[in-house]
UniProtKB/Swiss-Prot annotation:
Keyword Secreted in record: yes
Described purpose of this protein according to its UniProt entry: J region of the variable domain of immunoglobulin kappa light chains that participates in the antigen recognition. Immunoglobulins, also known as antibodies, are membrane-bound or secreted glycoproteins produced by B lymphocytes. In the recognition phase of humoral immunity, the membrane-bound immunoglobulins serve as receptors which, upon binding of a specific antigen, trigger the clonal expansion and differentiation of B lymphocytes into immunoglobulins-secreting plasma cells.
Assembly notes: Immunoglobulins are composed of two identical heavy chains and two identical light chains; disulfide-linked.
Localisation per UniProt entry: Secreted; Cell membrane
One of the protein's GO biological processes: adaptive immune response
Keywords carried by this UniProt record: Adaptive immunity, Cell membrane, Immunity, Immunoglobulin, Membrane, Secreted
GO CC list: extracellular region; immunoglobulin complex; plasma membrane
Highest taxon in the source lineage: Eukaryota
Protein name: Immunoglobulin kappa joining 1
Residue ranges of coiled coil: none
Native organism: Homo sapiens (Human)
């Protein structure tokens, strides 16, 4: 899991 802006969550 990678967290971007804090409001956006991307599943890798």
């Amino acid at each position: 899991w990678t967290f971007g802006q804090g409001t956006k969550v991307e599943i890798k």
